[in-house]
């Protein structure tokens, strides 16, 4: 099992302090509608947030609250979970994307099966006819965008986004217009982040310890010293 959230109990305050790995950008928050069963499970709205000493109110990831079977007592949360290596919802997403890649007019059926299972209305082909321009300037079909958005909702904060972008041949640009923008603006390294498709930064560097111990590795991955 694994712990997705760093957490601790603050007895003087009578509340938990937890530190999610991610801050959702505004375009992610907008993906979640009120009718979506996942909205109140995956997101914590109106959360009191502290970033580098600056305090504010915003939206946080709250997807992994913890498996009760891993609790050591009834009062202390440990936020521990059994990682799901593969879920049935991923099969619907894979099916939708695979059908679309074989035929750009296909893929709507498995997409709608997942959407309706999550409380969303089914889409018609007329809903996804128009091309969509992404934040990084990439233009894709409306259907492929709907498939990507559904994957973004279902797989939120599960570590698949990097691999999705590589598979789709897309870059990304940080959307600084987040619910936490006033706090993010005070932390310079959080303000800008842009990588084009095919950037060497999509591949992690080889750890220095591995390079030192095994000279057969040769040179470091492109883009790293």
Please give the residue ranges for each predicted region:
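Acidic/polar-rich alpha-helix caps and helix-coil junctions
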Residues: 1-5, 33-225
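His/Glu-based metal-binding/catalytic segments typifying zinc-dependent metallopeptidases
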Residues: 1-27
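A contiguous, surface-exposed recognition patch within enzymatic or periplasmic domains that forms
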Residues: 30
């Amino acid at each position: 099992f694994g712990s997705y959230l760093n957490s601790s109990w603050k007895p003087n305050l009578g509340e938990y302090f937890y530190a999610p790995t991610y801050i959702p950008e505004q375009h992610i928050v907008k993906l979640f509608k009120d009718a979506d069963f996942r909205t109140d499970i995956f997101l914590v709205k109106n959360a009191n947030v502290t970033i580098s000493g600056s305090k504010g109110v915003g939206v946080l990831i709250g997807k992994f609250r913890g498996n009760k079977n891993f609790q050591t007592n009834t009062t202390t949360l440990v936020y521990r979970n059994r990682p799901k290596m593969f879920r049935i919802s991923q099969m619907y997403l894979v099916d939708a994307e695979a059908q679309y890649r074989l035929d750009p007019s296909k893929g709507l059926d498995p997409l709608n099966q997942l959407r309706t299972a999550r409380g969303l209305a089914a889409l018609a082909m007329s809903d996804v006819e128009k091309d969509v321009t992404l934040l990084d300037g990439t233009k894709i079909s409306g259907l492929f965008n709907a498939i990507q958005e559904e994957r973004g909702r279902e797989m939120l904060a599960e570590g698949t986004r990097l691999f999705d972008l590589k598979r789709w041949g897309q870059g990304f640009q940080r959307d600084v217009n987040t619910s936490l923008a006033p706090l993010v603006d005070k932390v310079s390294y959080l303000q800008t982040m842009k990588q084009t498709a095919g950037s060497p930064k999509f591949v992690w560097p080889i750890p220095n310890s591995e390079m030192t111990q095994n000279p057969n590795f040769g040179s470091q991955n492109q883009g790293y010293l």
